[in-house]
Amino acid sequence: MNAYKHLIRPLLFKLNPEATHAMARALLRCPYSRRLFGGQGLFIHDERLRVNLGGLTISNPVGLAAGFDKDCDMVNSLMGLGFGYIVPGSVMYHPRPGNPCPRIIRDPEREAVYSCMGLPSRGLDYALKQLGRRRYSNVPLIINLNAENYDDYLKTFEALQPFGEALEITLYCPNRPNDAGDFLSPGVAERLLVEIVKRKKKPVFIKIPGYRSENERRKRLNLVEHILKFPLEGITITPESLVDEGRLSIGRGTVTGRPMFRQTLSVVRDVYRLTKDKWHIRASGGIFTSVDAFEAITAGASTVEIFTGFIYEGWCIARNINQGLLNLMKKFSIENVTALRGAELKIGTRLHGNGGESLIGAKQ
């Protein structure tokens, strides 16, 4: 029995989502929490899971996405939960409160979350202080940053670079007031990336949203083509999920969780066709199980990232996905995760029956 899903989660879900996160944050900031989780065998040590991600050696392809540890003050504990890497942030240069509450709504029936956080942050100085207290180096940190202008991007990038094994730059936020998405314009993005490359000493990944229409698709893939000109390591793909939601304080928000998985797969396929092996693709959106991870990697992702799945599945999610991936690779005679990447066309006829039903199994 999954103790988290059947005992702990029902109790936590009776609380306000932000109160629940505050409780989790308090626990994970505790110096002894790593010992609490460390005895549960959350790491799967197997060479078949190892990934080279833009020069970084990653022990497994399951990462914790940006947004859970916004201020980098839980990294010591999060590094003990079995993830191949952690993405703390988004770190902002200046402290900011984000949008007013309510700004998070759960949808348990769909295993989804609606949110309009608006990038709340304690600011760069606080994040640097917390990162300076990092005690472990067994799990890489890919620090995520965001900003409202060029100067803040560059100052935040330079300050964070010594503290992580890599950096991730998010080019927009759909729930931030007055964000017109200007950095998603190829010309504006190129101007920023010219300066980033001059300062770059670590691997750098760019995070952009997906798309829901053919017009958005053309624009986003055009942006990817422009970004490909730069000596960067990869791209993080998240679904485009902005919806009207009257229960949120600003009347709209993003959807994360299971409803977004098929869109994630579609975007990964498009970007993989465009980039091939030139770039690493990190898939983030609706990944809950090893079957989800398997599909995302065969579609072209190098790694997958968990956020909403962590909320619904609990602290064993990385272990469960990694163990399931090993089982699936054995079933389909795939040597390792690196060989699994982009293998969709090779094994596609064995993944689905004549009626399109999955032959993998519902959950692993």
Q: Where do the protein language model's features map onto the residues?
A:
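N-terminal capping/small domains of soluble enzymes
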Residues: 1-140, 148
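Glycine/Thr-rich beta-alpha phosphate-binding loop at enzyme active sites
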Residues: 29, 36-44, 111, 174-187, ...
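Structural preference for beta-strand elements that scaffold enzyme active sites
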Residues: 61-63, 85, 140-144, 166-168, ...
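Glycine-rich beta-to-alpha transition loops that act as phosphate-gripper elements at the mouths
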Residues: 66-69, 144-148, 208-214, 277-291
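Catalytic cores of alpha/beta
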Residues: 73-78, 152-159, 213-229, 273, ...
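Glycine-rich phosphate-binding active-site loops on the catalytic face of alpha/beta enzymes
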Residues: 87-93, 170-175, 234-241, 287, ...
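C-terminal helical cap(s) of enzyme catalytic domains, especially alpha/beta-barrels
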Residues: 95-111, 244-257, 311-334
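Alpha-helix-loop-beta-strand connector modules within alpha/beta enzyme cores
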Residues: 112-115, 121-138, 185-206, 252-279, ...
